[in-house]
């Protein structure tokens, strides 16, 4: 269970960092928009247009990061299953995976894991599989050694 707790915490830290960064960027953009408005430069709206686009993009990314955090909050590191489910740590003959959210490579004491969404192509292949099952991804075959 320690493995899953470490992986889950790393993913939560990743999501919280993204949320913090997007909130900071949104505040910076809002300040720039206010600054432009106070300058009274009515002739040039292109600067604000770009800022509004950036604001919208960052707001969408913030929403995605918040959804990511909600998914993580619903994962119990103490759950046990013989089959791959959301929250499983999966060791294979080639790579190790943590089925959660797409958060990239995570290095913990037990080794390196890739945090992937269950909706990702490889996540969908792994879901429901058990120890000893083999899957093929991008022309590479590998076998599940352990589901934690």
Each language-model region and where it sits:
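Non-DNA-binding regulatory cores of transcription-related proteins
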Residues: 78-136, 142
């Amino acid at each position: 269970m320690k493995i899953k707790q470490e992986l889950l915490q790393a993913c939560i830290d990743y999501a919280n960092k993204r949320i913090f960064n997007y909130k900071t960027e949104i505040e910076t953009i809002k300040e720039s928009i206010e600054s432009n408005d106070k300058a009274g430069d009515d002739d040039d709206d292109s600067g604000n247009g770009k800022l509004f686009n950036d604001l919208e993009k960052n707001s969408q990314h913030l929403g995605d990061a918040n959804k990511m955090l909600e998914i993580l909050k619903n994962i119990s590191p103490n759950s046990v299953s013989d089959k791959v489910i959301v929250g499983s740590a999966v060791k294979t003959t080639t790579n190790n995976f943590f089925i959660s959210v797409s958060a990239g490579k995570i290095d913990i004491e037990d080794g390196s894991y890739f945090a992937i969404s269950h909706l990702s192509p490889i996540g969908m292949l792994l879901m429901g599989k058990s120890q000893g099952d083999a899957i093929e991804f991008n022309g590479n075959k590998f076998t599940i050694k352990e589901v934690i």
